[in-house]
């Protein structure tokens, strides 16, 4: 299955949540679902299954995860003791591409995924080009030393934008070193807002 590269505005309007900043801007201007009967579709109540499916799709699109990967993450979360939905969100937050995004090294998760794919990111000093890699507490995520001389990363440092960036509390950002440390597991409130994880659990528990 190919990764989604379609119009984020349409998807954001269909799901009722901005899956990117651009998607949120479009949603603010045009909140109705796309299509001729968008306003009517917005008023029509979803079935239980429809609501569960929509929540799963929201999380998939926001975090940029394919269906097979998403199911695997859910199964991993379900095997753990505790609240399955919250642990699922923790796994999504701890994906390497999401961490690169949360640290401010990229402006979107798609860009963060590209940086990882192209070998610009190291974990504990080792090049890691797998966006789905799950980071652990204590690990250090950084821009590869050989990549720091590239214009993009030099601008990140020279512009001071990282000094103003607010990383979540579970990550400690070192702007000068283009690195960040995982200091804790992400909490429920650290995950992307607008996702009802319990509906996702219900979807896979049918």
UniProtKB/Swiss-Prot annotation:
GO terms for cellular component: small ribosomal subunit. SUPFAM superfamilies: Alpha-L RNA-binding motif. GO terms for biological process: ribosomal small subunit biogenesis; translation. InterPro entries: Ribosomal_uS4, Ribosomal_uS4_bac-type, Ribosomal_uS4_CS, Ribosomal_uS4_N, S4_RNA-bd, S4_RNA-bd_sf. GO terms for molecular function: rRNA binding; structural constituent of ribosome. Residues 94-157 form the S4 RNA-binding domain. It holds the Pfam family Ribosomal_S4. PROSITE patterns: RIBOSOMAL_S4, S4. Keywords: Ribonucleoprotein, Ribosomal protein, RNA-binding, rRNA-binding. Part of the 30S ribosomal subunit. Contacts protein S5. The interaction surface between S4 and S5 is involved in control of translational fidelity. NCBIfam families: PRK05327.1, rpsD_bact. Belongs to the universal ribosomal protein uS4 family. One of the primary rRNA binding proteins, it binds directly to 16S rRNA where it nucleates assembly of the body of the 30S subunit. This is Small ribosomal subunit protein uS4. It comes from Chloroflexus aggregans (strain MD-66 / DSM 9485).
